[in-house]
A protein has these predicted regions:
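Short, hydrophobic beta-strand segments that form beta-sheet elements in well-ordered domains
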Residues: 105-109, 120-127, 142-150
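C-terminal accessory "lid"/substrate-recognition subdomains
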Residues: 100-104, 145-239
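Conserved lysine of the Walker
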Residues: 21
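Extreme N-terminal, non-catalytic leader segments
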Residues: 1-14, 18
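Active-site cofactor/cluster-binding pocket
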Residues: 99, 109-120, 126-129, 133-137
């Protein structure tokens, strides 16, 4: 089982091909890293036959033999390759894999998987104001943090930013992360998957766990700690 240490904030940069999504991702990563935040990214590649591995390589032979995951370690890099069909992988699984140890996970693409998820903020990259207004009226993406594109737009309920204004978008994201840090977080995992919890359940679970922990010898509880509960060995655990 991979470590389910999900990022505090997940942001999906979505939009049509050729609109500049990667440029926006680059700008956000640089700006957030400059603020001291840990940032991870994930990129959706639509090509069916795409693979980082190569037939005949030792790592490829490991996978062909049936290894669930193959980790390749070199002096300057560690890569892990897992084989599965994207339709078999829920978005939560992708997030769990991609965001280990990070404050923010930025995903490029994944429109169909993340487009309507309320726990994933969307930055929609467009070709112009007209496209932004059309997308806003269609309700294809929710919630939208901002549109990014050329020109200026009026009448939108969310900010419309130019490519040179990505820094201000990073400021908003950083503030959200800092607020989440300040209040602490509570998460419940069954196997590799995170179970959605409402605010009331989070608070009750947190109080129970911290109250129990405070009774243990040598444990000093402040009350603002993050709480993560892992239940292992669930049916369907993918490793």
């Amino acid at each position: 089982m991979w470590a389910p240490t999900r990022a505090r904030l997940v942001v999906a940069v979505v939009g049509e091909k050729g609109t500049g999504k990667t440029k926006v991702v680059e700008g956000l990563v640089r700006a957030l890293r400059a603020k001291g935040l840990k940032v991870c990214t994930a990129k959706h590649v639509p090509e069916e036959d795409f693979s980082l591995d190569r037939p005949g390589k030792d790592s490829w032979r490991h996978a062909e033999a049936g290894a669930l995951a193959v980790t390749i370690v070199s002096p300057g890099e560690i890569d892990t390759i897992r084989r599965f069909r994207l339709k078999e992988a829920e978005f939560d699984d992708i997030v769990a894999l991609a965001s280990q140890g990070c404050d923010v996970l930025i995903v490029e693409g994944f429109s169909s998987m993340a487009g309507q998820r309320p726990d994933v903020l969307k930055v929609v990259v467009v070709r112009g104001p007209g496209e932004a207004k059309a997308i806003a009226s269609e309700g294809r993406f929710k919630p939208i943090l901002a549109f990014v594109g050329p020109g200026e737009a009026e009448g939108l309920k969310v900010p419309y930013l130019g490519f040179g204004e990505v820094g201000s978008l990073a400021d908003r994201i950083a503030n959200m992360v800092l607020k989440a840090r300040a209040k602490g977080d509570t998460r419940l995992f069954l196997g590799p998957r995170e179970v959605p919890l409402n605010a009331f359940v989070k608070e009750v679970l947190k109080r129970i766990v911290l109250a129990f922990a405070s009774c243990l010898k040598g444990v000093d509880i402040r009350g603002d700690e993050d709480v993560m509960v892992f239940i292992l060995g669930q049916e369907g655990d993918k490793g």
